A protein has these predicted regions:
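Membrane-embedded beta-strand positions in outer-membrane beta-barrel channels/transporters
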Residues: 135-137, 181, 311, 333-335, ...
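Small/polar (Gly/Ser/Thr/Ala-rich) solvent-exposed segments
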Residues: 47, 71-85, 121-129, 139-168, ...
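Amphipathic alpha-helical coiled-coil segments
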Residues: 48-63, 169, 173-192, 210, ...
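Bacterial Sec-dependent N-terminal signal peptides
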Residues: 1-36, 40-43, 457-460
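Acidic, low-complexity, intrinsically disordered peripheral segments
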Residues: 24, 32-33, 72-74, 79-98, ...
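Periplasmic alpha-helical coiled-coil/stalk elements that build and connect Gram-negative outer-membrane
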Residues: 2, 33-34, 58-60, 164-281, ...
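A subset of solvent-exposed loop/turn segments in beta-rich extracellular surface proteins, enriched
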Residues: 82-125
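Bacterial Sec-pathway N-terminal export signals of envelope proteins
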Residues: 25-86, 216-218, 254-296, 300, ...
C-alpha cells in the first residue's frame, strides 16, 4: 500500500514544473546581464583587441604627423687641425687688390708705391679652427602624393575591422557565460527534482515501516526503499560536484566572487523570441569587409609612391662668429621629390595588397554561406526544441498518471514495491527531461540570435 498525494498537491507540483514553459516573453535575467558585463570587462582577449584598436588609432596619428612641420634645434662644437685659409697666391692677390682700392680712395696714383703708414686688413680665414654652432631646422612636407591620405583611410578601416572583431569576440564570451549560467540553472532544477523524489521516498518509507509493523509488508520492501534513497543521495552528491565546477567556471569567466556566485539560484526561463524575426549583418562579416577596404586603400597608398612630393626646408644659425665665409646665416627652400622608377617595388607591393583584398572577399562569401546555413540549422533546432518540450510535458502527464495508478494498486496489494519505485523513477526521469528540454530551448534561441547577428542587442 502507499500514502496518496492529494490532487491539489499533484496540480501544484505540475504548475511548478510548467512555470518555465510559460515564460516565453521573459527577457534575459538582469543578474546574467551583469555577469556578462563583468565577463566582458575581465576578458583578456577583448582587452587585447582593444589594445590592437588603440594601435590602429596611433597609426592614424602617425600618418597625419607626416604633414606636420618638424622643428629641430642643433648644437655642436668642432676643433679642426688648423684654420682653413686661402693659398698664398690668393692671399697676395687679395692684399694687392686691397692696396689698389685704398690708393684709389685716397687719390694716390696707380704707379706710386703704397704708403707704409696705412694699415692693411688681414685676409680672413675661410674657417676658423674652433667652430661653435647653434641652429634650428624646419622640415615640412606640404604634399605627400596622397600617401598620407590613403594611409589614414586604410588605418581607419583597420580600426573598424578590429572593433568588429572585438564585438564578435564579445558575443562568443556572452554565449559561453549564458551557457554556463544555464547549466547552473539546470543543476538547480535537477536538485528540485531530487527533492521531489526524496519527498516521495520519505512517504513510501513511512508507509512501509507501518506496513511491516502490521505484518502487511516484508523487510525486503524497506531495504529497497533504502537502496533507492542511497541512489538518490548519490545523485545529490553529483549535484554538489556539478554546482562547484560551474561556479568555478563562472568565477573564471567573470571574476565574480565565489561566495556571491554560490548565492545564485538561476531559473531555466525561456528567452524572449521578440528579436528572432530580425536579421543583421554579423560582426565577423563587417570585420572582413572593413579589412578588405583597408587592403584596397593600402594598395592605393603604395601606388601613390609615383606621385611627386613637395616639401619645405628652412635653416637659421643663432651664432654667426664661427660661420665660414661660405656658410649662410639662414635659408628657406622648397623641393620636389619624384620617384620615377623604383625597380617595380611599389607596383609589386600594390599588387600584393590587392591580392590580400581578394582573399578577404573570398572569406566574406564563404562566411556568408556558412552563416546562412547556421541560421537554418538554428531555426530548425529551435522549432525542434519547442516540439520536444511539448512531448516531454506529455511524458510527465503519463508518468504522473502511471505513478498514481501503481500507487493505488500497491495500496490494494495489486502491485509490488518494485513497481512503485519504477514508476517513481520514470516520473523523475520525465522531470529531468523537461528541464533538459528547457535548457536546450534556451541554447537554441541564443544560438539563433547569434546566427542572425542580433545577440549583442539581447544582452546589452
Amino acid at each position: 500500500m502507499q500514502i496518496n498525494i492529494s490532487r491539489f498537491g499533484i496540480l501544484f507540483i505540475a504548475l511548478i514544473w510548467l512555470v518555465p514553459s510559460m515564460s516565453m516573453a521573459q527577457q534575459l535575467d538582469p543578474i546574467l546581464k551583469e555577469l556578462i558585463s563583468k565577463g566582458l570587462d575581465k576578458s583578456h582577449r577583448i582587452n587585447v583587441h582593444d589594445l590592437d584598436t588603440e594601435q590602429a588609432k596611433v597609426d592614424q596619428s602617425l600618418a597625419k604627423a607626416v604633414l606636420l612641420p618638424k622643428v629641430t634645434f642643433n648644437g655642436s662644437f668642432t676643433r679642426l687641425d688648423d684654420d682653413i685659409t686661402f693659398d698664398d697666391d690668393t692671399q697676395n692677390l687679395l692684399i694687392a687688390t686691397q692696396k689698389l682700392l685704398i690708393k684709389e680712395a685716397v687719390g694716390i696714383p696707380f704707379n706710386d708705391p703704397f704708403p707704409g703708414n696705412i694699415p692693411l686688413t688681414e685676409v680672413a680665414n675661410l674657417q676658423d679652427q674652433n667652430i661653435l654652432k647653434s641652429s634650428v631646422d624646419l622640415d615640412w612636407v606640404l604634399f605627400s602624393g596622397l600617401e598620407v591620405t590613403n594611409a589614414i583611410r586604410a588605418s581607419k578601416h583597420k580600426e573598424a575591422s578590429l572593433n568588429y572583431v572585438g564585438n564578435a569576440e564579445k558575443d562568443k564570451i556572452a554565449l559561453t557565460i549564458i551557457e554556463t549560467y544555464d547549466k547552473l540553472a539546470l543543476v538547480y532544477a535537477s536538485k528540485r527534482v531530487l527533492t521531489t523524489s526524496e519527498n516521495y521516498l520519505n512517504e513510501q518509507e513511512f508507509y512501509v515501516k507501518k506496513a511491516i509493523e502490521n505484518g502487511l509488508a516484508t523487510p525486503i520492501s524497506r531495504k529497497k526503499i533504502e537502496l533507492a534513497q542511497q541512489q538518490l543521495a548519490s545523485k545529490a552528491l553529483e549535484f554538489n560536484h556539478n554546482k562547484t565546477v560551474l561556479i568555478e567556471v563562472l568565477h573564471q569567466l567573470t571574476g565574480e566572487n565565489r561566495e556571491n556566485l554560490t548565492l545564485l539560484h538561476p531559473q531555466l526561463q525561456s528567452l524572449s523570441t521578440a528579436l528572432v524575426s530580425n536579421t543583421e549583418k554579423r560582426n565577423e562579416i563587417r570585420a572582413l569587409e572593413e579589412a578588405e577596404k583597408a587592403s584596397l586603400y593600402k594598395s592605393k597608398m603604395e601606388k601613390s609612391n609615383f606621385i611627386p612630393k613637395l616639401a619645405l626646408k628652412g635653416h637659421y644659425e643663432f651664432i654667426e662668429d664661427d660661420l665660414s665665409l661660405l656658410d649662410p646665416k639662414w635659408f628657406v627652400g622648397a623641393g620636389i621629390k619624384w620617384n620615377v622608377f623604383d625597380g617595380f617595388q611599389s607596383h609589386l607591393k600594390s599588387k600584393k595588397s590587392i591580392i590580400e583584398s581578394q582573399k578577404y572577399r573570398e572569406q566574406i562569401e564563404e562566411a556568408e554561406e556558412m552563416i546562412a546555413l547556421s541560421i537554418i540549422e538554428a531555426q530548425l533546432t529551435y522549432e525542434s526544441s519547442l516540439q520536444n518540450t511539448k512531448i516531454v510535458q506529455k511524458e510527465i502527464d503519463l508518468a504522473s498518471a502511471t505513478y498514481n495508478m501503481v500507487d493505488k494498486q500497491f495500496k490494494n496489494n495489486l502491485a509490488s514495491i518494485n513497481d512503485v519505485l519504477d514508476a517513481l523513477t520514470d516520473l523523475e526521469k520525465a522531470h529531468f527531461k523537461l528541464q533538459e528540454s528547457f535548457f536546450g530551448q534556451r541554447r537554441s534561441i541564443a544560438n539563433l540570435l547569434h546566427a542572425k547577428g542580433i545577440l549583442t542587442a539581447f544582452y546589452n
